[in-house]
Amino acid sequence: MSDTLTRLAQVLEERKDAAADSSYVASLYHKGLNKILEKVGEESVETIIAAKDAAISGDCSDVIYETADLWFHTLVMLAQLGQHPQAVLDELDRRFGLSGHAEKASRPSA
């Protein structure tokens, strides 16, 4: 895992037990999963809009910024659920060399 992800995962874990007024992340944890999911949704929409704008303008700076926000809030969500970013990286590794069609077919039906 990248050093940045490792450091971020460590900080996110530390903030779980911090006072709500001590940091933005601690305040999200104290507000609960629904607030965190709201932020993930908000950042998803902002990332989509930034990508559409980048396709027109050729300037990807906003899409990079918004993607960082989306990843960040997704990592907060995973931490809230007791999951580590390594679990996502492991899943991506598992999919390497596997056709997208084969991967989709291997999923249990919902």
From Swiss-Prot:
Catalytic activity reported: 1-(5-phospho-beta-D-ribosyl)-ATP + H2O = 1-(5-phospho-beta-D-ribosyl)-5'-AMP + diphosphate + H(+)
Domain of life: Bacteria
Cellular component terms per the entry's GO annotation: cytoplasm
The UniProt record lists the keyword ATP-binding: yes
Gene3D superfamilies reported for this sequence: MazG-like
UniProt-listed Enzyme Commission number(s): 3.6.1.31
Cross-referenced InterPro entries: HisE, PRib-ATP_PPHydrolase-like
Keyword line: Amino-acid biosynthesis, ATP-binding, Cytoplasm, Histidine biosynthesis, Hydrolase, Nucleotide-binding
Pathway membership, UniProt: Amino-acid biosynthesis; L-histidine biosynthesis; L-histidine from 5-phospho-alpha-D-ribose 1-diphosphate: step 2/9
Molecular-function GO terms, alphabetical: ATP binding; phosphoribosyl-ATP diphosphatase activity
Matching CDD domains: NTP-PPase_HisIE_like (cd11534)
Example GO biological process: L-histidine biosynthetic process
Localisation: Cytoplasm
HAMAP family associated with the record: HisE
Family: Belongs to the PRA-PH family.
Entry protein name: Phosphoribosyl-ATP pyrophosphatase
Gene name tied to this protein: hisE
